[in-house]
């Protein structure tokens, strides 16, 4: 999310990123409070398209941060946002880990997620992606 005054700049930047990487990106959300959501339409089995999508997502998060916003302003972080959240909040990660350890010493609440995340996040997604499919014939070269 970004501040309301930055929404037009963010949406324009997202459109430019979509064109740059030749991907379809839908932007929607709660513009009145700066919460923007982007959804990309890609074939996760097409390695080239997947790679372009990953680059586009990283640039979208960079734009949000550059405009004074955040990579996650409304919902939980989730696995797909984890790398960019970690980059944005580097100075806070040790505190997050300490709070998690103090509140959940047996690690039964959402184990292996953000506070323990070491990447790459792609291995834990619920849909296939080229990096973790090896040389499957389903991957389009």
Name each region found by the language model:
Residues 1-141:
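Conserved glycine-rich FAD pyrophosphate-binding loop
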């Amino acid at each position: 999310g970004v501040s309301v005054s930055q929404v037009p700049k963010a949406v324009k930047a997202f459109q430019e990123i979509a064109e740059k990487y030749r991907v379809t990106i839908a932007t929607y959300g709660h513009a009145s409070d700066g919460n923007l959501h982007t959804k990309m339409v890609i074939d996760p089995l097409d390695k080239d398209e997947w790679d372009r999508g990953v680059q586009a997502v990283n640039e979208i998060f960079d734009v949000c941060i550059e405009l004074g916003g955040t990579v996650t302003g409304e919902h939980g972080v989730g696995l797909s946002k984890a790398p960019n959240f970690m980059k944005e909040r580097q100075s806070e990660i040790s505190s997050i880990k300490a709070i998690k350890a103090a509140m959940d010493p047996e690690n039964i609440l959402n184990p292996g997620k953000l506070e323990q995340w070491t990447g790459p996040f792609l291995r834990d997604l619920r849909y296939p992606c080229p990096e973790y499919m090896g040389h499957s014939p389903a991957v389009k070269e």
